[in-house]
Amino acid sequence: MSRTAVAILSTENLLHNLKVIKEKAPQSKVIAMVKANAYGHGLRSVSSRLERHVDMLGVASIDEALILRKIGIQIPIILAEGVFEPNELLVASTEGFHVVFHEEAQLQWLANLSCPLPIQAWLKLDSGMGRLGFNIDKAPGFYDQLSKSPQIAQPIHVMSHLACADDPKNPLNQQQIDAFNGFIKGISGKGAYSLCNSAGVFQYPVAHHHFVRPGIALYGASPILGKSAAELNLKPVMTLQTSLISIKEMAKGTPIGYGARYLCPEDMRVGIVAFGYGDGYPRTARDGTPILVNNTRCKLVGRVSMDMIAVDLSPCPHAKVGDPVILWGNDLPIEEVAAFTENVSYDLLSGVQNRVKFHWTRYINTSTNGF
């Protein structure tokens, strides 16, 4: 029998979250971000489920975009990090990918090539993130350069990225919004504008513009500090489930796991769970990290190992070998788990390893003990 670790993924919840996002930004089109293997949920599976419901898909590399074309995805795809070398411009031209231009070298590559078809271009501004994008003071010149290029389809689109939208109290948010608005008011183009990520969708309706670019919210995790996914009416797409493979009666003072970090404070039942950091569970998880056994809240004890973790079964005295264990997802918000680690929900979702089986279903049902 194979390992029982499985990621149960809900199409219903994915589409529910998209509906919530559309209700928050009713005048905007949606670029669904499926980069990084759709935040760990499966690039192909997520994209095929979203294709009929969104306007574009967003990826980080041309390799991801080509995978989507290979499986028959026909809607526009945007390369959010642009191209990494000159020949990728030729591929983007042929395949009809939208390309983000954020670096002067990319414009030089463009000038030295003869693309088969005009490229749909997005100029990226660094409005305060300090990452990719042209500085605001120099961006008008690069915008004009793209506008005059015969290899670029007109009009030129413009985007930027909010650095602190998850924290509504941070003054940088309004500074970035003002900088972005100032730039687009100064150009005469008729292209589309995009500024908001998931957090921006919920926090800054005045900045929604033509396109919003939700990522983590699509997958049912909260993008906002201090607010749960449930408060935002988001539902987890992934429920990570496994099972108990051993139950031990431990005497008071018995150490558990590598480094003997945890010493049993009393005689207790401890369950061994078939999941570890080799599957994607965070090695930094502390004692007390919540885990559901038979839908009962229990606590992690001892250090996470590659293939196993241990759990205090005191709240679940009738647990037996084979009983289901939920590590995050349905009834156990991933943000709550992340709070006991040195990670955030993004890390946990995108870190699930390929030895975990993925099973898509319309309705999540974790009450059965079958895999």
Q: What label would you give each PLM region?
A:
Residues A5-L9, N13-H16, E23-S194, H208:
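Active-site-proximal beta-alpha core segment in soluble small-molecule metabolic enzymes
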